[in-house]
Amino acid sequence: MGPLSGLRIVEMAGIGPAPFCGMLLADLGAEVIRVDRLTAADLGFDIDPRFDFPNRSKRAIAVDLKSPAGVALVKELIASADALIEGFRPGVMERLGLGPEVCQALNPRLVFGRMTGWGQEGPLRGRAGHDINYISLTGTLSAIGPKDGAPVVPLNLIGDFGGGALYLALGLLAALHETKASGKGQVVDAAMVDGVASLMTMHFGYLQAGFWRNARGENAVDGGSPYYSTYLTRDGKYMAVGAVEKRFFGQLLQRLGLANAGLPDQNDRSRWDELRARLAEVFASKTRDEWTRVFEGSDACVSPVLDMEECVDDPHLAARGTFVRRDGAIEPGPAPRFSRTQAEISRSPVEPRADTRGALAAWGLAQARIDELAAAGVIAPG
């Protein structure tokens, strides 16, 4: 059983960070029931439920949230929950009749987790946005990319999942801990702009200390330095180099056969371009896999750049079980690891219309009540 075993969480279905937060908590043992609309929302794309991994380890129900009976059912679930997760724009839960005041009147200990991009307050609170917008406004996107080019758009990991889902999970667990002492719930306002700004804490400090330049691609660990970058190999693939410390940089040069080549000091910014060109020339002489073997066993901080199909077979990740194979799919396993109360994927993602009856029964609703709701069209018949 995971370390969060015994926690009960209602998750209002959505996409991106809110369901990912629910997945993290469910993998750690929390009992999470996902509430989907009876009529699926048009998100502009469809994905086979088997591969909708953020919905794993949860039960799911489909409810008519436009009907008073459907809202009453959700209130019934909330009354016995420890926490709620929702990722709608500000005001949507209130319009459904499920705002914090209503829910905490039913359950004073409820921790009400709200996941948004802009936050519950502020002039942009009601505006649409995505990861790229949240990282652009916080100084993050401006700092990513080469010095002579446009900002490079990263995967939607920084805002959605780093600054969003992880901060919501942290906030929920902190509030749940406080509830043990106070007996009172509270609202957790997890805004991606706040989370992303928080992730930039070190960089803002370095900037004001004069250690970091306010220009992308000109710093030690933003791709500006030749010792923290990627290099093209003979077969058109790449190696990643992170030899920041002098002793690691020394091993890098040794393995490249450049230890006695009279190269510039690694921290001589005026000669970074010269050093980078020399490293690039050598890396281009072998294939990625050949270089991987060259650096095996070293502390040069050099690794192959693997794609999502290659990484699942990496020997180190395979030894740790970082990726798991189940039900015909490959997915990242739960993280982090625990010595006694191991996290686990307790169930594969389910289609809510097929799981509704079982999920409600597992939550504690009587069979007669479930039959009544299904007959009235309040829930999916499955």
Residue locations for each model-derived region?
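N-terminal helix-loop segment corresponding to the beta1-alpha1 unit
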Residues: 1-171, 175-181, 351, 355-382
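Terminal low-complexity tails and localization/encapsulation signals of metabolic enzymes
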Residues: 1-8, 215, 232-234, 310-382
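Short Pro/Gly-enriched beta-strand edge/turn motifs at strand-loop
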Residues: 35, 209-216
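Glycine-rich beta-alpha junction loops
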Residues: 39, 118-119, 192-197, 235-237, ...
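Conserved Rossmann-fold dehydrogenase catalytic segment
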Residues: 120, 148-158, 180-196, 216-223, ...
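Oxidoreductase and adenylate-handling cofactor-binding alpha/beta cores
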Residues: 138, 164-185, 198-209, 251-259
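Aromatic-enriched alpha-helical interface/lid elements that frame and gate functional surfaces
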Residues: 227-298, 302
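Conserved PLP cofactor-binding pocket of PLP-dependent enzymes
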Residues: 296-317
